[in-house]
């Protein structure tokens, strides 16, 4: 079974990330904090067996080679649209590349236990669950896992 992991990220530019945090600590400090979280997330997910994470960047097209090299990761550019549309396109691309099950996480949850991601893959694979959500306290979710994209 080919497992995919999408990490949604933004280029850590001052004024472009963690804007609510930046209001109290400044644009550069917020960008530095975001970059630290991103690096921690990437370091963690590289420990997953048989999973090659792909970072989907919200960035200019010309930034992809530099970001791929700097963060040593497979990189793609996020599509346009709202978050749901961008996630859908990312899943579609991963499944088109032969991925059997795929999860998506954000780049600002460095304390997300790898066990949670592994459990999502177990549910999607062995138990053939169609979709898995990792609910967060704020009413959103920290992980979405799918076996396929539905129309």
Regions found by a protein language model. Give the residues of each.
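A short, N-terminal amphipathic alpha-helix
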Residues: 32-51
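Short aromatic-hydrophobic micro-motifs that form the base-stacking/packing surface
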Residues: 103-105
């Amino acid at each position: 079974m080919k497992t995919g992991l999408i990490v949604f990220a933004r280029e850590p530019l001052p004024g472009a990330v963690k804007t609510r945090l930046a209001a109290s600590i400044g644009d550069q400090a917020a960008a530095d904090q975001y970059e630290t979280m991103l690096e921690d997330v990437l370091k963690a997910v590289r420990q997953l067996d048989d999973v090659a994470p792909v970072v989907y960047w919200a960035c200019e097209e010309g930034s992809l080679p530099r970001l791929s090299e700097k963060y040593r990761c497979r990189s793609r550019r996020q599509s346009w649209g709202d978050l749901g549309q961008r996630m859908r396109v990312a899943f579609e691309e991963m499944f088109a590349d032969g991925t059997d099950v795929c999860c998506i996480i954000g780049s600002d949850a460095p304390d997300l236990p790898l066990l949670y991601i592994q459990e999502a893959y177990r549910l999607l694979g062995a138990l053939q669950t169609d979709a898995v959500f990792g609910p967060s306290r704020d009413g959103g979710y920290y992980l979405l896992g799918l076996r396929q994209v539905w129309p």
